[in-house]
Structures are given as C-alpha cells and as structure tokens.
From Swiss-Prot:
GO terms for cellular component: cytoplasm. Monomer. A motif ('HIGH' region) lies at residues 129-139. Gene3D superfamilies: Arginyl tRNA synthetase N-terminal domain (3.30.1360.70), HUPs (3.40.50.620), Isoleucyl-tRNA Synthetase, Domain 1 (1.10.730.10). This is Arginine--tRNA ligase. InterPro entries: aa-tRNA-synth_I_CS, Arg-tRNA-ligase, Arg-tRNA-synth_N, Arg-tRNA-synth_N_sf, ArgRS_core, DALR_anticod-bd, Rossmann-like_a/b/a_fold, tRNAsynth_Ia_anticodon-bd. PANTHER family: ARGININE--TRNA LIGASE, CYTOPLASMIC (PTHR11956:SF5), ARGINYL-TRNA SYNTHETASE (PTHR11956). It comes from the Bacteria. Its main location: cytoplasm. It is an enzyme of class 6 (ligase). It catalyses: tRNA(Arg) + L-arginine + ATP = L-arginyl-tRNA(Arg) + AMP + diphosphate.
Length: 584
C-alpha cells in the first residue's frame, strides 16, 4: 500500500508538470512516503510539497493543495488531508485495511516478500572466526545478525550468497598446531612446558587426546629435544612462541607437522560448523584462505595494485598507498621476509568476490575492526571498484549477565562462554531473538535469566506465545465444533470495527513495508521490534475480545483476523531464525 500511495503522488507530479503547474525543467524527486506516527492523522504521510516548494517557487501548502487536486482516484484511499506546513496525510478505506488479511492468508509464507532487490547479487560474509577455538557469545551475535540480515534481504528480492571466510593460513595456525602438539606430548607422558601465549582452552586438550588416539606415539618427541636451544619465555613471550613453532616444525618434519596442523584445523572447524548448524546458521560456502594462496589469488591482487600504480617498495617491503584514498597511513602488503600480510589476503579476498560477479559486498565484522574499514575501502578504490559496493556492518559484543552479575570472558586464557553453552542454557530461539533485538552497533547486555523466563517481559517468549496461543484458539474451537467455516475472501471483515481490531489490521498491512525497510537499511532489528509490537497487540486483543460467540459471521471474521496474525508472526520469526511453536 505504501508503494501505491507513492505511485499516486508520482502520477500527480507528472500531471502537474505537463499542465505547467511545475517548471518543465524541474527534476522530480523520488517520492518519500512514511507511515503516519499518529493514526488520527491518517495512515500515510508525505512531505512532497515541502521538498518541492523551494525549487518550484511556491508555498508548501499551496503546492500541497495542487498535488491533492491532481491525485488519481483510488479505491484504496478514503481521503487526503493537508496538515501543518504542507504534509499530505492519506487515510485508507476500511476495505483497503482489511485486504491485508486476505492477502496474508492467500500468500501464506510468501506474504511480506517483494522484488525491491530486483535480483541484485549480494555477498554476505559473517562470523568468519579464526578456526583456533570454539565460537563464543561474541561470535553468536554476528551469526544471528548476519543470518537474519541475509534472510531479510532474500525476502526483499535480493540474490544472497552466505559465506564464511576461514583464516586457515598464517601465524595463528602455526600457534594452534604447536599448542595441540604440546598437549599431544602431555597425553603421551612427556613433561613439556606449555607457553603462556599458546591456546589454553580445554578443547585443545580434548583434540590432542583425539590425535593421540588416532596416531598413537607417531609424533612423540622428548621434552629435552623440544627445549633445546629455545630462548627464555619471560624475556620475549612472542619471540619464544615463534621459536617454539619453528622448533616444532623442525622436529616433526613437514609431513607430520602438516598432519598435526590439519588435524587441529579440521577438528575445530568441525566444531564451529556443528555449532552454527545447531544455531540454525547455514552457509553456501566456507571459503579457505589457503585457497587464495594456492590459486595465486594474492599475487594476482598485488599485481593489479602494482599495475594501477599504487604500490612502492621501502625498507625491503612492498607497500600499498592507502593514504592516497583516505586511510590514515600506507599499508604493508609483503614484509621484508617475503611473506604477505593479512591485509594482502583481505585485498585478494575482496577482489575475488568482485570478480565472482557480486554487486554488493556485505561484511559483518566485530566492532573492534572499525579501523580496518578505511584500508579495505582504499584497496577497492585503487582496484577501480566503487567503494560504495562494500557495506561493512559492525557488531558490538554481547555482555552476559546472570543474577545481575557480569560474566567474564577471555579467549586468551581459555575462560570464555561458548556459543554452545549459551544455546544449551537459554535455547537457540531466545539467543537468536535477543541478539537481533537492537541495532548491531549498539552495546548489548544479555540477561540470561530474562531469556529463560516464561513471562511477558521476555520478548521471544511473548512473540512465540502469541503464535502458540492462536494455534490453541483454533484447536479449542475445533474441539467444540466452532471452527471457522468461511474462506478469507468470504469472511465478513467489515464486522471488525473494534479499536483492537483496527490496530491489528494496521499492523498486518505494515508487515511488507517493515521487511522492505529492514532490507534497505540492513537492519533486521526492525523485524524483531515489529514482531514485539504485533504480539503485544494480539495479546491485548485476546484478553479483550471473546471468540466463542453465537454470532457466526463476527466469530469467523475474528478467526480470520487472528489466523492472518498467526501467519505473519510465523513469517517474521522465520526470518530471524526463530521457531513458531504450535503449543507452549
């Protein structure tokens, strides 16, 4: 309906220009229509007259009067009023409001979907946690946000590709391999010393024992061999770690070292996949950083930057002139030891996405990566790519509270709350809904006690209970032989004249607009907020209006209304990855 109102306004402006009521050379703006904030002022409002007043050299209210006179007739519009400095307020007919009920039931699971995206190809990369440990609650928010955003974009007609970038190359993988091997040696009875900067979690011990069970003592070396020639850890912890990695690689040999590294990677990545699957998050592809190396994609990207004239050599390293494109300084692509940097791999990965034909790249990153955005944008500009094609969404970490107390989290020490633990405690649905209730860039306090409560204060429970309650209504009426006997097209929806019914009708008609708005703004929290509003309206209606009445026509109309409400609740919850239960 919002599009219909915008179309009427566009037709009116065109007619005015043709009639000489607007300058012939005036460029008509894209018509903006919004839901009226106060239902007393109508259903939709447009500020078109105020936007055009200055370029048209007319008073806003006079221009609004002319626009109103030029609006085509519409069976959906009951009236148009001019308010304030020149707002055009549109009021829908009762029939137009009721039509959303019929459309929702006619379209079912498709209700709310549109073609606003016009098949635009969107690549969305999210989570992409290093495969060096289990997913924690911070990753969980990125997973819930990214997956919900992808679903909302799909519902709005975009062609979406979900991808997880696996950082399976570089120093952190060597540290992982060394950490696992040391725990493996412990499992074999060797009294080795574990570095403070190694990966400390129990998951390393678990996977090391699995390696020992699989390969026996094949990779065992003595503690004396390992410690020979290593520097003191206290003097330079990071240098000690690098020396330990080099010593591990030397003692094992390349084949055995690769076996240990691959075992660790596959075990942890397997855990990550399992956690995401259980969280309802699925990808089209897990993209390996190693693939960029093996297929020469990093060298290809560096050659492209060099050909464009934006690289130089200094201090034995290869640099990118990022500062030319607005970054605060130039960035190293290849170190003086010949190894490429993480940034070089990121440039190659983004170029690869572009060369795969995606129109827009959406990156869901932790808020701590905000400083990384300008350098990636700079690289794209240098490669001749419009930086506007990159849309980085920053996600703040969630802070967990239990009993009013903040829970600590530290990945370095191995003491952190994993996504699996959160899911086991509050359930997938509560976790996913809580994660997307607010804008992704806002700090979030996650109250575990609230997420587990069965009360109106728990937003996911409140929304799911609304759906289950409607299902219960139909079960009870079926048992009494009072089930709805008419189709949506036959229902006497004109009987729905109570204020609570008008509110529900208005909300049901808004749903497609909410999906479109959430997609265009890249804000799935809009859907969560809408569902809370719809659930609250239904519960109020349920408590105020009886369904078991003798008036069959009114009863069937009310049942048709709540059935449409159930459908919209199910559709919206589905986009957020939350189940819509039949009973609770």
């Amino acid at each position: 309906m919002k599009r219909h109102v915008a179309s009427l306004l566009a037709q009116a402006l065109k007619a005015m220009r043709e009639a000489g009521e607007l300058p012939a050379d005036l460029e008509l703006p894209e018509v903006q229509v919004e839901r009226a904030r106060d239902r007393a002022h109508g259903d939709y409002a447009a500020n078109t007259a105020m936007v055009l007043a200055k370029p048209a050299r007319q008073k806003p209210r006079d221009l609004a009067e002319t626009i109103r006179s030029r609006l085509p007739a519409s069976e959906a519009i009951a009236g148009v009023e001019i308010a304030g400095p020149g707002f055009l307020n549109f009021t829908l007919t009762t029939a137009a409001r009721q039509e959303s009920v019929r459309v929702a039931l006619r379209q079912g699971a498709e209700y709310g979907r549109s073609d606003v995206g016009a098949g635009h190809r969107v690549h969305i990369e999210f989570v992409s946690a290093n495969p060096t440990g289990p997913l924690h609650v911070g990753h969980g928010r990125g997973a819930a946000f990214g997956d919900a955003l992808a679903s909302v974009l799909e519902a709005a007609g975009y062609h979406v590709h979900r991808e997880y970038y696996v950082n399976d190359a570089g120093r952190q993988m060597d540290i992982l391999a060394a950490s696992l091997w040391l725990r493996y040696l412990e499992a074999a009875g060797e009294p080795v010393s574990f570095p403070n900067k190694g990966y400390q979690g129990d998951y390393i011990v678990t996977h090391a024992r699995e390696l020992f069970e699989a390969d026996g003592r094949e990779h065992v070396r003595t503690a004396a061999e390992l410690g020979a020639g290593l520097p003191a850890e206290d003097d330079d912890p990071e240098g000690y770690l690098d020396a330990l990695v080099a010593r591990s690689r030397e003692l094992l040999g390349e084949t055995a070292y690769r076996r240990v590294l691959d075992f660790a990677l596959e075990a942890i990545l397997g855990d990550i996949r399992a956690d995401l699957d259980a969280f309802g998050v699925h990808y089209h592809r897990y993209f390996s950083e190693r693939q960029l190396v093996d297929q020469g994609r990093i060298e290809h990207a560096l050659e492209r930057l060099d050909q464009a004239g934006y690289t130089y050599r200094a201090d034995g390293a290869l640099w990118f002139q990022a500062s030319v494109f607005g970054d605060d300084k130039d960035r190293v692509l290849r170190r003086d030891n010949g190894l490429t940097t993480y940034f070089a791999a990121d440039v190659a990965y983004h170029l690869d996405k572009i060369e795969r034909g995606f129109d827009t790249l959406v990156n869901v990153w932790g808020a701590d990566h905000h400083g990384y955005v300008p350098r990636v944008q700079a690289a794209l500009k240098a490669l001749g790519v419009d930086a506007e094609r990159l849309d980085v969404r920053l996600v703040q970490f969630a802070i967990l509270y239990r009993g009013g107390e903040k829970l600590p989290m530290s990945t370095r020490s191995g003491e952190f709350v994993t996504l699996r633990e959160l899911r086991d405690e509050v359930g997938k649905d509560a976790a996913r809904f809580f994660y997307v209730m607010r804008r992704s860039e806002q700090h979030m306090d996650f109250d575990l006690d609230l997420a587990k409560s069965e009360s109106a204060d728990n937003p996911v429970y409140y929304c799911q209970y609304a759906h289950a309650r409607i299902c219960s209504v139909f079960r009870q009426l079926e048992e009494r032989g009072l089930a709805c006997r008419v189709t949506p097209d036959e229902a006497a929806l004109e009987r729905l004249d109570a204020e609570h019914e008008a509110i529900l009708l208005d909300l049901l008609g808004r749903y497609p607009e909410v999906i479109e708005s959430a997609a265009l703004a890249r804000e799935p929290h809009q859907v969560a907020q809408y569902l809370r509003e719809l659930a609250a309206a239904f519960h109020t209606y349920y408590n105020a209006v009886p369904f078991i009445i003798d008036d069959e026509a009114l009863r069937d109309a009310r049942l048709t209304l709540v059935q449409a409400t159930r459908q919209v609740l199910a559709n919206g919850l589905g986009l957020l990855g939350v189940d819509a239960p039949q009973s609770m």
